[in-house]
Amino acid sequence: MRLRHKPYAMDRINEYSHIVIGNPEERAGNWKEVFGNEQPIHIEVGTGRGRFMYDMAKANPHINYIGIEKFTSVVVDALDKLIEEEVPNLKLINKDAEDLTVFFAKGEIDRVYLNFSDPWPKKRHTKRRLTYKTFLRNYEEVLVEGGEIHFKTDNQGLFEYSLMSMAEYGMLLTYLSLDLHNSDFEGNIMTEYEEKFSSKGHRIYRVEAKYRTEPMQ
C-alpha cells in the first residue's frame, strides 16, 4: 500500500484526542475507565482505515473496540469516519503494535483481530509477521486467560505459516475456513481489503485460535 502524506493528520489527531488516544502506555490497566464501563475489550492490530472496527462497534455496542494502526496518514482516515459519526465504544491508537504489552495490562483484552496483515513474504522478514511467535507471546500477555485471536487473509502462504506458528505455540485452532465466503460462517464483517480481494475472486482464509489454559500433555 502506497501511503500519501497528509500534512494535516497530526493536528487532526491531536484535536480529537478523546478518539485517538495519545500516550496509550499511560492507560494500561485502566482502559475500562477510558470507555466508562465494564464491557469486554477487543482490539484489531493493523486497523487500517477502520472500516472493520467501525462496523463491529456499531453491530456490537456491548463490546468495546480499539483499533491500532501505526501509520498516521492511514489512521486519520479512520478518525475522519468517527468525526462524522462518533461511535462511543470505539477508540484508536496511532502506535506500533510491537509495544502492545506497554499499552495494556496483563489480561486486559478479551480478543485480538488480525485482518489482511502484511504477509512479509521474504524469509528474512519472518519476524515482522504479526503471527510470528514474538507477537503471539505479546497477544497472550495482554489477553484474558484462554483469550482468542481471529485472523483473516487472502494470502495462502501467510495463512499456512500462521497455522503452523499458532500450532507450534500450542494454541487450539477452534475454527478454520479455507474459503470463508463460500462457507456456512455467519456474521462476517468485511474489511476494505477483503471486499477488494474477494471481488477479484481471491479466496479468503479465516482461523480462530485460542490460547490454552493448561499446558499440552
Curated annotation (Swiss-Prot):
Which reactions does this protein catalyse? guanosine(46) in tRNA + S-adenosyl-L-methionine = N(7)-methylguanosine(46) in tRNA + S-adenosyl-L-homocysteine
| Any one GO CC term of the record | tRNA methyltransferase complex
Q: Does the keyword tRNA processing apply?
A: yes
List UniProt keywords, sorted A-Z.
Methyltransferase, S-adenosyl-L-methionine, Transferase, tRNA processing
Q: Which family does it belong to?
A: Belongs to the class I-like SAM-binding methyltransferase superfamily. TrmB family.
Q: In which pathway does it act?
A: tRNA modification; N(7)-methylguanine-tRNA biosynthesis
The protein, known as: tRNA (guanine-N(7)-)-methyltransferase
